[in-house]
Each structure stands twice: as structure tokens, then as C-alpha cells.
Amino acid sequence: MRLVALRTVAHGVTPAVHTENVAYEADRPYEVAPCDPCDPTGQSDGLPSDSDRVERWASTMRGIRAASGVVLAHDMEPVAVSGIAALERAEREAHEESLLAAGATLSKGAGRRAHPEPPDPYRTCFERDRDRILHSTAFRRLAGKTQVFVFPADHQRTRLTHALEVAQVATAVARATRLNVALTEAIALGHDCGHGPGGHASETAFGQFLDGGYDHAVWGADVVFAAMNLCEETLDGIRNHSWSRPVPATPEGVVVSWADRIAYCAHDLEDALRAGIVEVRQLPQGITDVIGATRSSQLRTLIGALVGCITRRGVVAMDEEAADALAALRAFNYENIYTRPEAIAQASAVISVLRALVEHFSEHPDLAPGSARRPWGLDSAADPVRAAVAYVAGMTDRYAFEMALDHLGWDSARLPTGIDMPALRPARARRLLSVLVGGPEAPAPLPGHAPSAGPYQRMVSSLR
């Protein structure tokens, strides 16, 4: 197709665009500011004005309506894709049979769910699982949950960025070794959705309330994702991704177990280096000589080692030299990052907060929001303690600490160190800000007059 019409029009003229195969016009007129011949943008600095940007954005509200009855996203020549039949699920499953390695998990014949569902016309069962996890509330909340640092700096990892990096490592390995990429990605994205606020300290906090303790992997598969009706292979991989758990039932699940360890060892070190907690010169030579000192070098080497072992030996494992270097890196991180005195103090404060919240909401389930009285389908009336654990475990770091201030009346000094108090929204912060706008004894506005809305008043309103 060849675009043959004008691309800009004067004010009030609807642009008509014609190609050899389709004609269409904009859904509404839009205005183009008069142009200076020496400055076609109408701006002396060559940049469009704010009003121009707003008008152009508004003109795209409903897209470009084509004469053939379709709507185009861009006021430009359509990109032609002709002679294509939809690639349906059954055909893609057949492709898997010819592409994937022996022993890989095939989508066809797999994907048993607790509650049977009709198949999707285009997506495999594991692609549906991946999409459900990706769009879930539990996955989004990982953005507000600790990886290593409570309330990390902008460039430091959260549980969400960790999950994304695990998915990248795992799918790189799965693709190179002809395993099921969609299943691998689903397990990787969902593997940490059972974590509570404050990182692994939450497992210690919640463990005393539950028979058998609290394991984020098991909790994620059996509680958080229970209502999503995921495939048994996906749930198995999530439930058993930790090395202390039984071996996953699929090779894709084992790949995620390795990818999780590879990713967090490399990126936790990088975050600690940037935070000034450790220095490169502290790394043992047994690490740097084998896998390097940077995240990119470590990922490249360890992914290559895993792929190489799988393709040479036919088992999801790693040769000893690389595995020993990974183990040494993990030990270094434990000694210098995870168990440093500041980290232990932070974890202790997190445990105190979470235990107090569970006790509070198990004794007063009516104080939780209505939707939170049956978290993940658990009935607070039938089992108030387990329901309280589920409610608190679903909180982000920030929300849990707000609850401690608002519901428990805690002083901020009891919270984990490093928390940015102005970023929270507790009643304590509102009371503090009320002093800035006149305090509780500030005179009431005259009848018929609204109170002034200066910057401090607007700040207080935004915290409500």
C-alpha cells in the first residue's frame, strides 16, 4: 500500500487519507497551529506546545475510521498483513510436538485443572496460566514487597523486578534447550507471589500461627492462586521452586529453581554494590575467576553453564565448576548482605510488625475491610487466624507499616529503619501535617465560606 494523501490539514478540515486498497478519514477534525515557513513546528525552539500535544492526543481518541469499516491506530499507511489464517491452539500444540525436546512438557494432553475448563481457541493451557498470573493482584503487589531492602531506592529490586528477571533467565534457558517456554514463564512469574511484606522475614513472622509453618512457595500455590484454577504443572513448579522442597514434576519447574537462584545471587550483589554495602574487591577469586564480578558476566556464564549441561548430559543441572562458583556467591551474599547486623535488625522489626497485625486482625476481623474478611476465599469466621495471616501476607510493605501506625497506634520508631515517613499515609502523618495548617484548634471557616485550599491543605487532603 502507498500513502498518497496529505498528512496535515488546516483547522477544521477532516484529514482524508487514501491508499491503493483502503480509504479512511479521521474520526474528528483536529487543529494544526499555523506554521512559520522558517519554523514548521510553530515553535522557536522546534518543540510542539502543550496545547498542540493535547490537541493531537485528543484527535486520536477513537482512532482513524476507515471506509472499509475498521478503525486504525495511526494516521498513516496501514501495515499490510495479508493471506494469514489465525494460528490456532491445536496447530501450535502440533508444532510443539515437532519442536520440543524429548521429556519437555507438551501442552497437548497436559494442563489438568481442579475445575475443568474449555480450551482457549488460540492460547495453550500454560499461556493462559501465564496471562492469569501476569494480570493478577498478587503479581502486581510484588512491586511493593521487599526483595532485600525495605523501601528500596528507585534502582533497587523489588519482588516484582526479581520475578521478571527470573522469568528472563528461565525462558532463555528453556528456549535454548527446547523446553516449554510458556510453562517456564508461568512458573517463574508466579513463584514468589506467596511472599508476605518484608521479604523472607514474613515466613518467620507467620510461621508461629500455622501448623507446619509458613512457606511462601506452598502458600502461593495452595492459597494465593487457588481461585485462579491454574494447571497442576504450573502449581507444582511454584510450590516446589525452592531447593529445600521436593523436586518439581517437570523439567521446566527445575529450570525455574535454577533461574531463581542465579537471578537473586547476581542482582542482590549488584544492589548491594550500588548501595555501598560491599565492594567488588571483597569477592573471592573463586567467584570472579569463574563467573566474573558483574551481573551481566555472572548471568551470561551461569545461563551458558546450565544450557551446556542440559544439552550435553540431558539433565537439568550445572557442571561442578560453575555450580561451585554460584554456591560461593550465594554464601558471600548471606555473610555480607542478608545477615549483616542492619539486615537482621530490619528483619526483626518486620517480624514484630507482622505478628502484631496478625494478632490484631485475628482478634478483630471486623476491623478489616469487607473484601479482606475472606482473603483468597478463607473465611475469617471459620478460621480467624488463618484468614488474618492471609490478609496480612497479601499486604505490601507500605500498607503493612501504615496499618501498624493507624490500627495499632505504633510509634514510627518501632518500624524497620530506612522507611520514608512522608511517603506513608497514616493518621500520625495527617496529625503532623494538621499542625502545619493551623492545628486542631484552627478556627472554623465562616458560614457559607469554604476553607482555603493552599498547598498544605491540599497535601492533607491527598493523605485522606
Locate each region found by the language model.
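Histidine-centered, transition-metal-coordinating active-site segments
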Residues: M1-L160, A170-V173, N180-A182, S202, ...
